[in-house]
Amino acid sequence: MIDLYTWSTPNGRKISILLEELKIDYKVTSINIMRNEQFSESFLKISPNNKIPAIVDRSNDDYTLFESGAILIYLAEKTGKLLNSNNKEEYYRTLEWLMFQMANVGPMFGLSLIHI
């Protein structure tokens, strides 16, 4: 079971989409960033940089992880799906596109929320 701490942002949505695709059981806790809930003491224990999304993997000794890219890689490797670590070229090509999305495409989607 994964506990997902998130809000309705592009980065937050990425994780729930992957959890659904991988058919991993999860529970969502909304962290309302418009009300500064990301600065609560309880959330800081999960995400020390005050950012969403973050997860707690209850099946792995309550392992915590923040940053969408790190979470996506963790979930893909945890299930053995989507990342083919047996083929290093394919593995790194996938990571290359993930990093491109995180550095270039993702921020543009996030900026669009400022005007809403």
Feature locations, PLM:
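GST-like domain detector, emphasizing the conserved glutathione-binding G-site
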Residues: 1-113
